[in-house]
């Protein structure tokens, strides 16, 4: 089966992550994630792969045994769910790009504009998969699934090509805090290291990401009727605003870039009696990350001394920087990726990821995992698109990694 046909088949499953179910501990959060996993399981089985596990939580693990000695066992990861930014069914279509704007939906006047996407000039003459402008495409991360299954198909059809053990793993609910990867038992993999395919444009290669933590501060006020509140009412909402005002104003997402960390005040809810404030902490450098956590803890202690034990703070690490587990830029997983790019004449775009991905959770469990491109653009948007040449290149890269690792 052609890789594009595989991808479009996967987009027909509406696997929008369900945040409400996720918060309740339901996995997969959307039952269609399991349906897609079952579909892929059957597909892998039809290729001749015998060692396949599909768990009730939609985690799918398949293994292709090594056909040579002394080659590392390599895992390839993708996620089944799509972002909840848009929830409509995907209506994917292929267009031949000749330049200029791409009409996604003539009836509704929706266009993928060249002025907003100047990188399109690289794809003139290419086939591009787009939507009708009313949904996500789901290249994040179904392009990855297509790439990995296509790679598996190659090795099953070419048994004379030497390779180590290949592990395929698809997980649910990445889009709401790496839930599937956190639930994964890596002991079932038997992998030495791995690659997530969850980057965007062709050439992207990531082996650094945020250290991330969640901060929750609960402010306790004293309620009173406003007609006789003088000297009695303590408004927890105003306490929260005073706390926020103590944060460094320039260290926020909208004022930072590259490896600059931040505090993100992302949610404030409550009333005069009780208010909950949620803050995301992000930093690449581990010592700086710890200093941010200490800063918030010290700030809460000082606040309580001033206002009389009016706040309670909870700090929880969400995920860590993958580079911590890869050790250095000469590690085997990074070298194999760079060599594959070079042999395929793909210019690597190496950059720190101002976000997280499944590899962060998986690396912390003992399987160092970096992040490779899928070829898609404009993730989490109705203007998401996937150049076919980039999708094919993604699969060629991981195929080359497996072959080179066995040499």
Where are these regions (language model features)?
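Zn-dependent metallopeptidase/amidohydrolase metal-coordination segment
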Residues: 10, 271-273, 348-405
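N-terminal capping segment at the start of a domain
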Residues: 2-30, 130, 223, 377-381
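Active-site-adjacent substrate-binding region
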Residues: 238-255, 262-264, 320-370
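Flexible, glycine/charged-enriched surface loops at secondary-structure junctions
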Residues: 51, 160-165, 249-264, 303-316, ...
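Midchain, well-structured core segments that form catalytic/ion-binding scaffolds
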Residues: 126-136, 173-297, 301, 310-311, ...
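Short glycine/serine- and small hydrophobic-enriched flexible loop segments
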Residues: 149-157, 242-249, 400-403
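Active-site metal-coordination/substrate-binding segment of hydrolases
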Residues: 70-162, 170, 393
